[in-house]
Regions:
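Active-site or pore-adjacent capping/gating segments
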Residues: 13-23, 31-134, 212, 250
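Residue-level signal for secondary-structure boundary elements
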Residues: 8, 66, 105, 109, ...
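Glycine-centered short loops/turns at secondary-structure junctions
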Residues: 7, 61, 244-246
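C-terminal non-catalytic regions of proteins with extracellular/luminal or membrane-system context
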Residues: 1, 20-25, 39, 45-54, ...
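Short acidic/polar active-site loop segments enriched in Thr and Asp
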Residues: 9-10, 63, 267
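Alpha/beta enzyme core
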Residues: 2-6
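Catalytic core of the metallo-beta-lactamase
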Residues: 28
């Protein structure tokens, strides 16, 4: 209700049943409650593969089935020819879709125009919001006096996400723009004091002032991943903490992980979640003591 009052343009229905009917094809939910009682006039769309009856779908007040028809055994055209729906029902389904496109100027956009100028002007504002969000979410799970790093400390960095932005899969697989990798963020913050190794030796680990190990998971909807880290990441952490007690483990994940066997051996553990486009900059500043990990 608060979202509608704020002018939200689109509502997605859920996967569950409400009063015995699937939410995405429920006239009670979409027409009576959402459009009637709450006064929503925008676009309504299904979640992916969440409706099962084309006639109910059309008569419910739904506008878009995503990602397309999958379970229905009859088309809208067939329903129309059988008299089970009318052209007015189709018009009612299409009208909010077209109105939403007009509202956001989609029909005014040129075919090769990726971003409208007024949207491009807002990118710095959006980047600042992304940085602030990541900054306020970082959690310091453990710190045995190592952080913040002392001036002049040299860092050996290794692990999964030096050059990749960790993110979820499915609807969480948002690539973003102007992404800053962990490698770039560390180089910006520490310059020549940070070195990188793809497969560090035991001797390299032991010789470093501080070791930073980047690990994490790629979480996804509808998939139950193992609670443990990927085996290669788990092995790398074990090697690092075994060779150098001054090891910082940076975890980027969308949920919890098993840390048994190394949590009490690492000097510090940072939980950075999925960092987005600017989150690694925030993590670098936490390491340097310029930002408080207050998540």
């Amino acid at each position: 209700e608060a979202g509608i009052a704020a002018g939200v343009a689109c509502v997605m229905t859920s996967y569950n049943r409400i009063n015995g009917e699937w939410a995405g094809q429920s006239k009670e939910v979409i027409t009576d409650l959402l459009r009637g009682e709450l006064g929503f006039e925008g676009l309504v769309m299904t979640d992916w593969n969440s409706v099962y009856d084309m006639q109910k779908l059309i008569l419910s007040g739904q506008n878009v089935e995503m990602p397309g028809s999958w379970k229905e055994d009859i088309t809208a055209q067939e329903l129309l020819s059988q008299g089970k729906i009318t052209e007015a029902d189709i018009d009612a389904m299409i009208r909010p879709l077209i109105a939403t496109c007009i509202r956001f100027g989609l029909y005014d956009r040129k075919g090769d125009e990726k971003y409208k100028p007024e949207l491009l002007a807002k990118l710095p504002e959006h980047e600042a919001a992304a940085y602030r969000t990541s900054s306020e979410g970082i959690v310091l799970l453990r710190n045995d006096g190592l952080l913040p790093l002392k001036p002049g400390t040299k860092i050996l960095a290794a692990g999964q996400f030096l050059d990749e932005i960790p993110r979820g899969a499915g609807s969480a697989a948002v690539k973003g723009y102007n992404n800053v990798t962990l490698r770039q963020a560390l180089e910006e913050q520490f310059g020549a004091r940070v070195t990188f190794a793809e497969k560090p030796s035991k001797e390299q680990f032991a010789a470093a002032d501080v070791v930073l190990i980047s690990v994490g998971t790629l979480d996804a909807e509808s998939i139950e991943r193992p609670f443990a880290l990927p085996s290669s990441a788990e092995k790398l952490v074990q090697q690092a903490v075994g060779a150098n007690p001054r090891t910082v483990v940076l975890v980027n994940s969308g949920s919890g992980i098993r840390m048994t066997g190394w949590a009490d051996k690492a000097a510090a553990i940072l939980y950075g979640w999925y960092p987005g486009q600017n989150g690694f900059r925030a993590i670098a500043k936490v390491l340097a003591g310029e930002l408080n990990p207050s998540g």
